[in-house]
Amino acid sequence: MLYKDNNQIYKVDSMGDLTLMLYQTSQARLPDQTLDSWMLGCADRVQALYGVAIDCHSPEIFAEQLVSLGLLYPLH
C-alpha cells in the first residue's frame, strides 16, 4: 500500500506499519519519545489545529483516522 502526506510517500504493508513509518520519520519526535507518546502528541496537535479528536489506542486506528481526515492520502 502507498500513502502520501505533504512531504513523503510511504510504502507499507499495514496501517500499523504506516504509523510506525510516520513515527520514525517525524520531525516532531523527540529522541527518547515512545510511539504511544508520539501518537498522543500528534492527536493533541490535530485537536488544536482541526478541532477533531483522534483515537490513538492502537497504531492501526491512528493511521486509519489520519487517512479518513484527509491528512494522509492513499495512492492507487
What spans do the regions from the language model cover?
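Acidic, aromatic-enriched beta-alpha/helix-loop junctions
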Residues: Q24-G51, D55
